[in-house]
Regions:
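Single conserved hydrophobic/aromatic residue that forms the stacking wall/gate
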Residues: 1-7, 11
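Rossmann-like adenosine-cofactor binding region
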Residues: 12-18, 24, 38
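Short, flexible, mixed-charge acidic loops at enzyme active sites
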Residues: 16-21, 158-162
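ADP-ribose/adenylate-binding Rossmann-like module
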Residues: 23-43
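Rossmann-fold dinucleotide-binding core
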Residues: 37-120
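Helical "substrate-binding/catalytic lid" subdomain
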Residues: 107-229
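NAD(P)-dependent dehydrogenase/reductase Rossmann-like domain
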Residues: 211-255
Length: 255
C-alpha cells in the first residue's frame, strides 16, 4: 500500500508540477479543477501553487458509483471560489447530474472522504446483516426487497447487495481504493484530534480483506469474510453480475 501511494504521488507530481505539467500551463483567471478523491491538505497545497499563477483552484470530486459515472448520473461536489464555480457550472451540469457547491477550497474533498467512509461502513454492516439473514433461513430475495423499503435501506444496499447476491461482487471498485479512502478519513480524524470508535475498526477490516483476497479484489468481497467465517454464501437468483444505470437521462442542476 505504501509503495502504491508513492507511485501515485510520483504520477501526481509529474502531471502537476513537472516542467511540462499542469501548473506551468496555467495563467491568469484560468480555472483548475481537481476531481480525484484526495486529502484536503494536498488540495490546498496545490491550490496555493495555482494561485501563484494567478489562476483559480477548485476541488470537484464525484460520487455515485462507477455504473452511474458511465452515464453521467453522478453527484459533483465543488469547493472553492463561488464565482469560479458559477463560471464552470454549465460544464459540470453536462458532466454530472447533481452539483453541490460545498464552500471553501478543500471542503469538497473532505465531504467526499466522509461519504466514502459511510459507504464502507454500510458495506461491512451488510456482510453481517446477510449472515444473520442466511442463518435465519430467510428468503434472500425477499430480504433484499424488505431492506430496500425499510429504515435500514442505503445506496450501498440497493447497489452492492445485488452483485453480492449474484456472487460476482463486481462493483468496479477495488479493495486498495477503499483502503485509500478509509485511510484518508481516519487520518483526517486524527489530524482534527477527533477520537473515533468505528473508523479504526473499518480500516482494520479492509486491511484483512486485502490480505485475504488481494489489493485488486472487488471491494464488495469484504462481505466474503463473513461468508468464509460462517461457512455460508449469500447467493440468490435474479440479480445482475454487474450494475447498469437505467435511470432516464436528464440535465444536471445545482442542488
Amino acid at each position: 500500500a505504501t509503495l502504491r501511494r508513492q507511485r501515485q504521488m510520483c504520477i501526481r507530481d509529474r502531471v502537476m508540477e513537472s516542467e511540462d505539467g499542469v501548473l506551468n500551463g496555467l495563467s491568469e483567471n484560468k480555472i483548475w479543477l481537481e476531481m480525484s478523491t484526495t486529502d484536503e491538505d494536498e488540495v490546498k497545497r496545490l491550490g496555493n501553487k495555482v494561485i501563484s499563477k494567478k489562476a483559480i483552484p477548485l476541488d470537484g470530486p464525484v460520487s455515485g458509483g462507477c455504473h452511474r459515472a458511465a452515464t453521467g448520473n453522478i453527484a459533483i461536489f465543488v469547493g472553492g471560489e463561488r464565482k469560479a464555480f458559477e463560471k464552470i457550472l454549465p460544464a459540470l451540469t453536462v458532466m454530472g447530474r447533481k452539483v453541490l457547491h460545498t464552500g471553501e477550497l478543500g471542503s469538497a474533498s473532505v465531504l467526499k472522504v466522509i461519504t466514502n467512509y459511510l459507504a464502507s461502513v454500510h458495506l461491512v454492516a451488510l456482510g453481517e446483516a446477510w449472515t444473520v439473514a442466511k442463518k435465519s433461513n430467510l428468503d434472500l430475495v425477499k430480504a433484499f426487497k424488505g431492506i430496500a423499503v425499510s429504515s435500514g435501506n442505503s445506496f450501498v444496499h440497493e447497489t452492492e447487495s445485488q452483485v453480492i447476491l449474484n456472487g460476482s461482487y463486481n462493483i468496479n471498485f477495488t479493495m486498495d481504493l477503499v483502503l485509500k479512502d478509509t485511510g484518508l478519513f481516519d487520518n483526517l480524524a486524527k489530524k482534527l484530534n477527533a477520537p473515533l470508535e468505528i473508523s479504526p475498526k473499518i480500516v482494520e477490516i479492509f486491511k484483512d480483506g486485502q490480505k485475504k483476497y488481494g489489493s485488486r479484489a472487488w471491494s464488495s468481497m469484504i462481505v466474503k469474510r463473513m461468508e468464509d467465517l460462517n461457512k455460508i454464501d449469500f447467493r440468490a437468483d435474479g440479480f445482475p453480475d454487474e450494475l447498469v444505470d437505467n435511470e432516464p437521462e436528464e440535465k444536471g442542476y445545482e442542488i
